UniProtKB/Swiss-Prot annotation:
Disulphide-bonded residues: none
Recorded family membership: Belongs to the XseB family.
Keywords: Cytoplasm, Exonuclease, Hydrolase, Nuclease
Protein name: Exodeoxyribonuclease 7 small subunit
Biological processes per GO annotation: DNA catabolic process
Domain of life the protein comes from: Bacteria
GO MF annotation terms: exodeoxyribonuclease VII activity
Function description: Bidirectionally degrades single-stranded DNA into large acid-insoluble oligonucleotides, which are then degraded further into small acid-soluble oligonucleotides.
Length: 80
């Protein structure tokens, strides 16, 4: 597991969430040393933030689609 302060922005929501769930299990079960747990916690924060960003992007895209008044569907990339 990578514990660097940079997270690959190309990681999918599902991959990030799965890794975050594994980190939570390890910390909850006490399977790591204190130092490893702190590193895992730091990685978990990065993953949580990444998941929140992906969810926000999806929500904004859905809002744009549903606000179209003339019933035509167009997708426009949203920068967050």
């Amino acid at each position: 597991m990578t514990t660097n302060k940079n997270l690959d922005e190309n990681i999918s929501f599902e991959e990030a969430l799965s890794e975050l769930e594994e980190i939570v299990k390890k910390i909850d079960n006490g399977q790591e040393t204190l130092e490893a747990a702190v590193n895992s916690f730091e990685r978990g924060i990065l993953l949580k933030n990444h998941c929140e960003k992906k969810l926000k992007e999806a929500r904004l895209k859905i809002e744009k689609i549903t606000k179209l008044a003339d019933s035509t569907i167009t997708l426009e990339e949203v920068e967050v």
